[in-house]
Swiss-Prot record:
Pfam families: DUF2786 (PF10979), DUF7168 (PF23771). This is Gene 77 protein. It comes from Mycobacterium phage L5. InterPro entries: DUF2786 (IPR024498), DUF7168 (IPR055592).
């Protein structure tokens, strides 16, 4: 059961992220999202400092990493997983995945306070991203493609459904990368403002996460991604994630 302070923080972050979604595609989205991530970063730092003070700054007695298992299903599974991987990395966690029929099982390792923050952000950002992507369109129409109809002897236009699916998958990947960058920036800002002690604590958190992953999955290996992304769609997702400009197709 979460305490009152945590609940208050979560309510504030959830409200900010809902406000960000309401103004998606505008500079205001960046302001709301950055503030939400800043609150999450400060909360994580406070919890780290509390744990350190309880242990007399003896980091050897700080909590070990734990495992959290979640599933990614539905549309654009591989691209969705990039959002979780990116946020986990920004929040000092490690991930490994196993492919399933129609989805992925993702194992996440991190100290409890980071896992808690990741679970909360994932519960908001993942459904938000999937709602937003349904309105994504390229700024320029797809170039028409034709196929020959042997029955009529004429060329007929091909459906653009496959191109749109590829574009949206790429948008998710770009959006996920931008979210990771913004979340990482807020984490770094919080740690730098707190001084060297926080840096030592967070470095230890990453080491604990990496150790837990190696112990649970000793034969894990890196696999090169096989998904190809539409460069325009990826860039579109990054722009919408960073909100560097206003006039995007997302605003519909």
């Amino acid at each position: 059961m979460i305490d009152g302070k945590t609940k208050k923080m979560q309510d504030k972050v959830a409200k900010l992220l809902r406000q960000a979604e309401d103004v998606a595609g505008t500079p205001e989205e960046a302001v709301f999202q950055a503030k939400a991530f800043e609150l999450m970063a400060k909360y994580g730092l406070e919890m780290a400092q509390v744990e350190a003070s309880k242990q007399g700054l003896d980091t050897t007695d700080l909590p070990d990493a734990i495992q959290w298992v979640t599933y990614v299903t539905g549309k654009y599974v591989a691209a969705q997983a990039l959002l979780l991987h990116g946020m986990a990395q920004a929040l000092h966690c490690k991930t490994v995945y196993a492919s399933l029929t129609g989805g992925q099982r993702i194992y996440v390792y991190g100290v409890p306070r980071h896992i808690e923050r990741l679970q909360f952000l994932w519960s908001i950002m993942q459904p938000q991203m999937m709602r937003l992507v349904e309105n994504v369109r390229p700024e320029q129409a797809f170039e028409p493609r034709y196929k020959y109809d042997y029955n009529t002897g004429e060329y007929k236009p091909k459906s653009t459904a496959g191109q749109l699916k590829s574009y949206r998958r790429s948008w998710i990947a770009g959006f996920a990368q931008a979210v990771k960058e913004r979340l990482t920036a807020e984490e770094n800002k919080a740690v730098e403002s707190a001084g060297g002690g926080a840096l030592v604590l967070y470095r230890g958190d990453k080491e604990r996460a990496a150790l837990a992953l190696r112990q649970a999955h000793p034969r894990t290996k890196n696999v090169k991604p096989r998904t190809r992304y539409d460069l325009s769609g990826y860039a579109h997702g990054q722009r919408d994630g960073r909100n560097a400009a206003m006039n995007h197709a997302l605003a519909g």
